[in-house]
């Protein structure tokens, strides 16, 4: 601090009127001697520094005026005693003094000019805060509501205050009385009238109350637009507004809302800001986007496709295939995947079984054993013995899914008892061809053999399905007979005891005959299955490989 106390007096002595650095006519920092400072800058004759300012600006390690770091004592002494430091200190204080003077002159000029303009023109012609002149009250209103006026208010008052022409008058009166404290008085002065801001544009009647000198007829389209909430002072301005983009956009939005109400769009969707296009299955967030989508090429194409298809879909179709084709076209036009499979796999499997029943029966010549020896057509593909179906196990229940017409069909088309045995014998004979036939078939191609075995397997499957259905229908018929017998027994119980004994003897004899018949049938079936097993064991390796690869067993 001793060094500082030694330096500061020298600095104060250097900043005196006699020193060349303190005179206004001396050279400045750039060395320009042609310009003199006293022509434009008032020079202070003496600079007096108090102790607090010295401590803030000049320290032992740093000079805030020059932004210089002082590490050593010799460096500090040479810096504070130098000419550059004295010149920068002088410029620093001159700059602060000029800024204060500029603020004072700006305040006084603004107040004087504001008072003169207010007296001469009026509140709708001039804004004293922004120094702006207006050509009409509408322009003045837009300025008072605008951003420039609000920014000026925030700069002066330090907070957001609504600015009106009445507050302009209060500001002018306060500035005339005390120009120095005008800023604080403006901040504390309340607004006398409500402002003409954007809320008065949305509410039609509020605008007349806010501006009593400029009343607007809301029913006159040349004075006010109800759709855009905008007011006009001339018919030309109204015409320009009606032909502008803003009015056209609002008009299109209103029209679109009316159309959406007519089509039955939910109010919740519109209130949430979601607009759905049912044809394209797209959700939009604004009505402008919805309007552009509805007018787009993609939507128009889809709409025309759906309309044409819906017109054609009202006709009566000749077949289900035509109706299904039109349904698929409509779904594809809407961008959806059509559902073409309406049945389950079980139904398809059952339909295949019913179709197999309708296939052609074997020729009657083969059933009775009449085979043409000249033409070897029946033995063309019988050189191999295909795999038969597994033996029927009577302990397992059979498939009871038999249509109601099966019993009547069986009674009408069932062959006699000996007919089934003749069919089995004929097929057994067909499976054992002569040596001549086997030699002819061995010379055939391998493709014919494979196709012949495949056809035989198909026939055998069909036969097995028919037999299983016949068995099921036979059981149903037996159940019906048993129920009839029970009814007869109940009727006989009401009659006399002698009649009951006689009837019971008859029924017991009939039951014994039925049991015998059932036993014979079971023995015959067991013999058939044994024969089929023996024939199945005679398969070759080629047939086994074919069955594994094609049939899966």
Curated annotation (Swiss-Prot):
UniProt keyword Kinase present: no
Biased composition range(s): Basic and acidic residues: 477-513
Keyword set, alphabetical order: DNA-binding, Metal-binding, Nucleus, Repeat, Zinc, Zinc-finger
Bias (Low complexity) ranges: 431-453
Pfam families the record matches: zf-met
Matching InterPro entries: Matrin/U1-like-C_Znf_C2H2 (IPR003604), Znf_C2H2_sf (IPR036236), Znf_C2H2_type (IPR013087)
Sequence ranges of Basic residues compositional bias: 456-476
SUPFAM superfamilies: beta-beta-alpha zinc fingers (SSF57667)
Zinc-finger ranges (Matrin-type): 61-91, 125-155, 223-253, 275-305
Name of the featured protein: Zinc finger matrin-type protein 1
């Amino acid at each position: 601090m001793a060094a500082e106390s030694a330096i500061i007096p020298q600095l104060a002595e250097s900043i005196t009127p006699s020193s060349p650095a303190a005179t206004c006519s001396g050279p400045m920092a750039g060395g320009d001697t042609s310009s003199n400072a006293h022509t434009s800058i008032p020079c202070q004759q003496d600079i007096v520094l108090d102790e607090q300012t010295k401590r803030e600006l000049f320290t032992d390690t740093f000079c805030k005026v020059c932004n210089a770091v002082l590490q050593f004592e010799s460096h500090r002494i040479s810096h504070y005693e130098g000419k550059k430091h004295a010149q920068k200190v002088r410029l620093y204080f001159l700059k602060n003094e000029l800024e204060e003077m500029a603020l004072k002159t700006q305040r006084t000029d603004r107040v004087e000019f504001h008072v003169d303009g207010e007296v001469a023109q009026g509140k709708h012609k001039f804004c004293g805060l922004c120094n702006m002149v207006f050509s009409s009250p509408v322009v003045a209103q837009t300025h008072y509501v605008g951003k420039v006026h609000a920014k000026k208010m925030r700069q002066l008052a330090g907070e957001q205050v609504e600015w009106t022409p009445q507050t302009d008058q209060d500001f002018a009166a306060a500035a005339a009385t005390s120009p120095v404290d005008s800023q604080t008085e403006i901040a504390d002065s309340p607004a006398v009238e409500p402002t003409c801001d954007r809320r008065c544009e949305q509410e039609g009647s509020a605008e007349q109350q806010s501006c009593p000198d400029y009343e607007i007829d809301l029913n006159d389209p040349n004075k006010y637009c109800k759709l855009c909430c905008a007011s006009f002072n001339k018919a030309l301005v109204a015409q320009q507004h009606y032909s502008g983009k803003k009015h056209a956009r609002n008009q299109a939005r209103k029209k679109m809302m009316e159309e959406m109400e007519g089509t039955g769009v939910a109010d919740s969707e519109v209130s949430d800001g979601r607009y759905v296009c049912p044809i394209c299955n797209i959700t939009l967030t604004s009505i402008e986007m919805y309007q552009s989508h509805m007018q787009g090429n993609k939507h128009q194409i889809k709409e025309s496709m759906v309309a044409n298809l819906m017109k054609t879909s009202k006709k009566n179709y000749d077949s289900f295939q035509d109706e299904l084709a039109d349904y698929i076209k409509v779904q594809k036009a809407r961008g959806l995947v059509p559902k073409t499979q309406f049945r389950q796999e079980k139904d398809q499997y059952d339909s295949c079984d019913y179709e197999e029943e309708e296939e052609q029966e074997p020729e009657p010549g083969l059933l009775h054993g009449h085979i043409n020896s000249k033409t070897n057509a029946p033995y063309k593909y019988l050189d191999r013995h295909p795999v038969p179906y597994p033996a029927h196990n009577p302990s397992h229940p059979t498939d009871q899914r038999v249509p109601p017409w099966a019993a009547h069909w069986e009674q009408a088309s069932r062959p006699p008892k000996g007919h089934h045995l003749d069919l089995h014998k004929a097929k057994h004979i067909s499976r054992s061809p002569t040596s001549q036939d086997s030699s002819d078939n061995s010379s055939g191609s391998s493709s014919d053999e494979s196709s012949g075995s495949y056809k035989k397997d198909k026939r055998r499957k069909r036969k097995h399905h028919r037999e299983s259905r016949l068995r099921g229908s036979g059981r149903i018929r037996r159940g019906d007979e048993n129920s009839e017998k029970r009814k007869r027994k109940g009727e006989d119980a009401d009659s006399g005891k002698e009649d009951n004994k006689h009837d019971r003897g008859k029924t017991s004899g009939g039951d014994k005959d039925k049991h015998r018949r059932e036993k014979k049938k079971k023995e015959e079936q067991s013999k058939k299955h044994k024969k089929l097993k023996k024939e199945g064991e005679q398969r070759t390796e080629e047939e086994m490989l074919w069955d594994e690869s094609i049939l899966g067993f």
